[in-house]
């Protein structure tokens, strides 16, 4: 078996490990460089290494920027559009939880947060910057278009197939680490509004 993400101890298997920590670090660093310090991180359950890594990248970027990590701004929800939309309506409508930016662990979650913000009359990116993860096709369909972490999907797919073929042939293979990651900056992020 070949797994995508996570280092699983399963006999006769290997994993393609993704740069999840580095990707979330890039996303959060982009927001801090725009002047944001109150950044909400909406992620998946920490029981999975992929999401632990993404939370770790977020906290690393905050710490490097001299921003105190606020655990109340690190939330775990189901990573779906609907769950993020419902959470976003509730969270963003509470004035005491004022944030200027949101980083999410996937694009559907970012889209749900964007829709909630827009329904509450919060302007994206003028009042709230939003960054997703995975850079799926949906990032080009939102209004504004969604800034998102880009993992090289073709390279990942190629490595998965190569590893599977080697395993089928009986070869013992090490895990493959994908190190390429970038941030596709689109229209959903802007400098913090200091008004």
Regions found by a protein language model. Give the residues of each.
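Conserved beta-strand scaffold positions in the cores of enzyme catalytic domains, especially
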Residues: 1-3, 13-15, 41, 74, ...
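An alpha-beta-alpha
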Residues: 27-65, 72, 176-190
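A short, gly/pro- and small-residue-rich
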Residues: 1-8, 59, 116-127
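Flexible loop/turn connectors
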Residues: 87-195
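Short beta-strand/turn micro-motifs composed of small residues
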Residues: 5, 17, 43, 76, ...
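Flexible loop/hinge segments that line or gate small-molecule binding clefts
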Residues: 1-26, 108, 134-146
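Hydrophobic alpha-helical segments within soluble ligand-binding/sensing domains
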Residues: 14-41, 56, 60, 81-91, ...
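Short beta->alpha junction loops
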Residues: 73-83
